[in-house]
Structures are given as C-alpha cells and as structure tokens.
A protein has these predicted regions:
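Glycine-rich, highly charged phosphate/nucleotide-binding loops
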Residues: 1-6, 57-71, 78-89
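Phosphate-coordination loops involved in phosphoryl transfer and adenosine-cofactor binding
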Residues: 16-19, 100
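Conserved beta-strand elements of the Class I
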Residues: 21-23
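NAD(P)-binding Rossmann-fold cofactor-contacting core
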Residues: 26-31, 37-58
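Short, acidic/turn-prone active-site loops that include or flank metal/cofactor-
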Residues: 52-54, 107-110, 129-134
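Short, charged, surface-exposed secondary-structure boundary motifs
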Residues: 57-60, 74, 113, 134-141
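ADP-ribose/adenylate-binding Rossmann-like module
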Residues: 95-118
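Active-site capping/gating segments
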Residues: 122-143
Length: 143
C-alpha cells in the first residue's frame, strides 16, 4: 500500500497542530494504538482518547465518539479497520466547520471514499503512515 503524497515539510507542518483525537486508542500497552498516543503525549501533544469501551486511558478521559469531545480537535488520528473509516470521518465532519485540519489514517489503513470526502471538506488526508514513526523520522535531530 502506498502512502499519501505529502512532502516531509508538509507533514512537519501538521505536527505544529497540538490537539489530536485518537480514535481506537487501546489500554493494552503492547498495541500501537496505545504506544503511539503515549509517545505523542510525551512529546507535548494534547491527546484526546476516543474509544466507546473506555472511560479513561493514559491518564486522560476517553470519549465514546469524536462528536462527544467538548474541546478543539486539530487532527483525527485513526486506529480502525479501513472499512470503519467512513463512519469515523462522518463523525469528524459533524464537528464545527474547518475545525479539523488533518484526518490521519495510521499504517496499513486507507479508505479511498473517505479520502475523497475529507478533501472535499477541506481536510488534509494522511494515510498509511504512523504518527510516531513519522515524528521520530522528521524530528530525530531535535531530540
């Protein structure tokens, strides 16, 4: 599976956004869906966990859906199967217009229809990339 066509400088720009809703976050510390948000917290990002089966994870309140989050969201980072992506995007699109800047599908995740719909709504789309791996790769010299 290919990745999106964003340049490194574009991806670096996305990391200036600090409020990240992580959909599909896990309390299992062996899963990437736990390790990635933990890493992002350690690097100064405001992680907002989204998982309907959790009330708290990583020391933060978890929300059942993106639509339940009262705070601002800049990026939606998704750890769900590709076929679940359209429903996640639909929830994201229920937020205030122009609030969400980036819809990020983690490594191995892609849905063409969701990509098209997000772009039509002015949201940048990143897919088949890990937020932790990309951060490490792009900012390694700054750590």
């Amino acid at each position: 599976m290919d990745s999106d066509s964003h340049s490194d400088s574009q991806i670096k720009e996305f990391y200036q956004l600090k409020n990240i809703a992580v959909v599909g976050v896990s309390k299992n510390d062996e899963k990437p869906s736990h390790q990635v948000p933990k890493y992002l917290i350690e690097h100064g990002y405001n992680i907002i966990p989204v998982n309907p089966t959790l009330t708290e994870v990583l020391g933060r309140k978890a929300y059942p859906s993106i639509t339940d989050i009262p705070d601002k969201i800049d990026i939606v980072d998704v750890f769900r199967r590709s076929e679940d992506i359209p429903a996640v995007l639909d929830d994201a699109l229920k937020r205030k217009k122009d609030e969400i800047k980036v819809f990020w599908m983690q490594s191995g995740i892609y849905n063409q229809e969701a990509e098209r719909k997000a772009k039509e709504n002015g949201i940048d789309v990143v897919y088949n990339r890990c937020m932790m791996e990309e951060h490490r790769r792009l900012f390694a010299d700054e750590e």
